Amino acid sequence: MITVNVKLPPRADLAAAERLVESTCRSRGLSEGMKTSLKSYPGSIHWHFTKEGERGTIEVTLWKKEKRLWINVHDNRASPWTSKEAGRLKSALEGAIMKINS
């Protein structure tokens, strides 16, 4: 499994971060397949994003309580595009979050 932590500024607007995850993924051509919460991270927001016509899933989790945002690609959901996109998505999210917090 690949896990990529997204750096959040100390005073990040986490309500805006939720919207930014969705809009940033959409702008990168990713489709939201699922939005839920993870029992192991109470109060978290967890998404599955896919790419049309491709196999594989990128998971993104925002845990406001702990001020954490991370991206996962599980081995059973990996494909050639997912590992590359995980790093690119990290950069895109960090840039978008920095813009709204500056």
What are the roles of these predicted feature ranges?
Residues 26-33, 53-56, 99-101:
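Short secondary-structure junctions
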Residues 4-6, 21, 58-60, 69-71, ...:
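Hydrophobic beta-strand residues in large extracellular and virion-surface proteins
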Residues 41-65:
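Basic/aromatic recognition patch in beta-strand/loop cores that engages polyanionic ligands
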Residues 38, 45, 73, 93, ...:
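Non-catalytic effector/regulatory segments
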Residues 79-102:
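A conserved amphipathic terminal alpha-helix motif
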Residues 8-12, 53, 75-77:
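Beta-strand elements of well-folded, non-transmembrane domains
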Residues 1-49:
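Negatively charged, low-complexity tracts enriched in Asp/Glu with abundant Ser/Thr
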Residues 56-84:
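Intrinsically disordered, low-complexity regulatory segments enriched in Ser/Thr/Pro
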